[in-house]
């Protein structure tokens, strides 16, 4: 099944072109599903693996999810044998939207997504209201101050993330204690250590702290921090050149199997990547048998990882699994004090208390709120006071004004260029389903209605459907900036429309 040219790039282009034709004529795929395939770019064929590039995680998840079986079948039809796709996420480089450069325009009316735009990769790069974006972009799971990423080129560790800058509390104290034991080399019984919890709760901070402390104890150690995406891309790169692939694979194996401490972040994103998981399995075994330290972080417990073979999950569970939870009030206040101290800012206690009381989900929320307050104070030449903080953050605080669910549906429909009937109707396409879930979430957050009553308003849906929608949007707000922006912008608009 090798193209006459012998060129893996040309071969991939031919295979993908034919595969795309097969998929486009498939009656089982919706136009929306076929649309996900348009932005896929073939990079090369290496044995039974075709490397495909996508420009964002939404496309990746769609293709690896609902489209996976259809894609495998189409590849089999075209090539006459089993061929497996390996994906690389290669973000597009796009110019900054003009609307983001106009802070004087607080509510750009023309940047709400149309039905055709909603969910497309090109739209995800645009914040809904750039001047009101509540949180700064950050690479860390547990940000402490507005510090630049200080990543070591060899170990990939962020030197700013240490145990000293990690604020302990009831929600994370056990995880920190175990992590410190692993870093000191006294936690042999905890190998591997698996840390899991929601986004923004400190997992990445702990991984980096382990590596940094281990090097302080023994500078001769070989330590490597890597995300699952980086591990995948390095493995795919090692396969790229057919003339040198054996040497590159050997180099890849040496790089990872000779480390003393391996720290791998966001392991859940390896799910379903069969070739990469097989490589990681052998890497894991080699390190574990050599008594090397392995620490992994995930958003779910090992037993709940999707797309992982039982043999790998059982190895994860053979060590110790610990979780990190959202911080309690005292810990949130302590975190804010740490952030302020590292920024060299003096923030009154009543301001820190206010922010800690109102922002409860994760550390990113806390830092974003504190950053917004200090920025407004600095730009307006005012001292940081509780009154200023309340005024600055009022858009994100709850209101005593009762908002009608029909107002929420109407506002969400208008925002996404849909109709009221679309949101209460039966359509399950993504460009309707996601706005509907957002509307249900807002109805739950901004009204006193029960889940059952909300379901009745949305076309007589079951209360479990509403519960699923609320959980889904709550989770995605932590994972995807654009979803967070949508909800915050709609919250502001609804509150304003009810106070006018």
From Swiss-Prot:
This protein's record includes keyword Transmembrane: no
InterPro entries, per the entry: AAA+_ATPase, Chromosome_initiator_DnaA, Chromosome_initiator_DnaA-like, Chromosome_initiator_DnaA_CS, DnaA_C, DnaA_dom, P-loop_NTPase, Trp_repressor/repl_initiator
Chain spans, region Domain II: 81-155
GO molecular function: ATP binding; ATP hydrolysis activity; DNA replication origin binding; lipid binding
Domain of life: Bacteria
Any Gene Ontology CC annotation: cytoplasm
Family statement: Belongs to the DnaA family.
Domain notes: Domain I is involved in oligomerization and binding regulators, domain II is flexibile and of varying length in different bacteria, domain III forms the AAA+ region, while domain IV binds dsDNA.
Name of the featured protein: Chromosomal replication initiator protein DnaA
Pfam families listed in its UniProt record: Bac_DnaA (PF00308), Bac_DnaA_C (PF08299)
Keywords assigned by UniProt, alphabetized: ATP-binding, Cytoplasm, DNA replication, DNA-binding, Lipid-binding, Nucleotide-binding
Functional note: Plays an essential role in the initiation and regulation of chromosomal replication. ATP-DnaA binds to the origin of replication (oriC) to initiate formation of the DNA replication initiation complex once per cell cycle. Binds the DnaA box (a 9 base pair repeat at the origin) and separates the double-stranded (ds)DNA. Forms a right-handed helical filament on oriC DNA; dsDNA binds to the exterior of the filament while single-stranded (ss)DNA is stabiized in the filament's interior.
GO biological process: DNA replication initiation; regulation of DNA replication
SUBUNIT field: Oligomerizes as a right-handed, spiral filament on DNA at oriC.
Entry's localization field: Cytoplasm
Region described as Domain IV, binds dsDNA: 378-500
Ranges for region Domain I, interacts with DnaA modulators: 1-81
Record NCBIfam families: DnaA (TIGR00362)
Region of interest: Domain III, AAA+ region: 156-377
Annotated binding of ATP, by residue: 200, 202-204
